[in-house]
Amino acid sequence: MNKFLLHITSLVALVLFLTMGACNNTPKTPILLEAEKTIEKQPDSALNYLGRVNSDLQDALQAQEYYLKALEIGEDSKDYTLLINTYNNLGTLYAHQDINDMALPMYKKALSYLELEPDSVKTAFTLRNIARIYSLTQKPDSSIIYYKRAISYSAIKNRASILTDLGNLYLSLKDYKKAYQCIEKAKPLIGNEKTLYFVYLL
């Protein structure tokens, strides 16, 4: 195991110790040995996971480093699912820092891999993420196009949130008729009209 992989293994092992209550005096429990084997076989997945952990810990630079290394390995392995997830995660990392010009290409790259390995749920969320970036960068026409595409791919349980986003965009454009239409479409999906109208009034 090379030095970098050993570093990854140590970090993931620590997480496993903390989350599973495996801390004891045994040098390596079976689950840690199994974790090491998994990391050796799928280092890109481990890197993506560590990126998520560091993102949650608000360490954006470290998260970015792990994501970029995961992508480097993933591009070689052609693991499309991992590439989709990692590009989306990296896009979200940039979006949370308001670096929208870097977030957008990451989401679009994820979308390109979704053409190679279709997944309607991931496609819907990726399209929604792209729509949000266009909305934030004052490109409402493009945002509307991507929101509508996201709705067409979305599962019923997720559709209300996308309709809410689109409705709020129409409100910001003072297109009250279309905003109302989004409310009406979301109502039967959300179950609580008061909650829905409250969201639109924010």
What are these regions (language model features)?
Residues 141, 148-202:
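Alpha-helical solenoid repeat scaffolds used for protein-protein interaction
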Residues 26, 76-79, 113-119, 153-158, ...:
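Short coil/turn linkers that connect adjacent helices within long alpha-helical scaffolds
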Residues 32, 36-39, 48, 52-56, ...:
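Conserved alpha-helical positions within TPR/SEL1-like repeat arrays
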Residues 1-45, 89-93, 130, 142, ...:
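Bacterial Sec-dependent N-terminal signal peptides
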Residues 50, 54, 74, 94, ...:
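Eukaryotic all-alpha helical interaction scaffolds
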